[in-house]
Amino acid sequence: MSNANDANNKMVATAEGLTSDAFHRLLELAITGRGKLLGARTVANNQLRHHHDHEAAIRWLSNQHIALAGGQGFATNWGGFLLSLVTIPANMAAAAFIQARAVAAIAHLRGYELDDPRVRTAILMAMLGPRGSAALIAAGDLPSSAAAVATAPAFDPRLDSRVSRALLEQSMNHVGGKRLGVFLAKKIPLVGGGVGAVVDGWSTRSIIQYAQEQFISRRPRSAGYVIIMES
């Protein structure tokens, strides 16, 4: 059954022009932003200026991004724009962008360099969520946790490739599950339209909680309020 699902996901991904490299492009967009679509650094620093505390900024960002994922407005307003930039199906792109930006913002506020390729691999690993990451580590497909990868001695391009492929496969499974859920929910009045948003909200909450566990603060306790500007 697993092989059949994998084959089906590959066919769907091919038909939709989706490759694992799309998640690298999406992460770049989530970090840097584009026009009115703010990137992780900007969102994080804006909240840090407002709250004057890194952890308070993280709490606010977490709640904001969970709400964005659980609503339908972001996908409606930005899904087509994201599709034009990263060739990911609009319904997948909106949720993945929100999750990538939230995780990157958490890493930024915890003192990680977002231009470091090790950190970017770790962000993609965090986007797999706790269950996805644990399953791949147990199977030997991933050597360690996102926390260890972010601070590894050197960048491992083969690991980065494996992580992005795993994220692609998981995302295709996720989309398939949402489609089934929406199909079934259409049989129930007043429910069908919100099922996909509920799934995205739940998965985003799980990913954000996992990211907070993995990206342990690298700031001294006495560091105080500092705006981090990366080159």
Regions from the PLM with identified roles:
Residues 93-102:
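Structural signature of FAD isoalloxazine-binding scaffolds in flavoprotein oxidoreductases
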Residues 73-93, 190-194:
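Conserved phosphate/anionic-ligand binding catalytic regions in large, soluble enzymes, centered on
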Residues 1-75, 101-231:
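Terminal, membrane-proximal amphipathic helices
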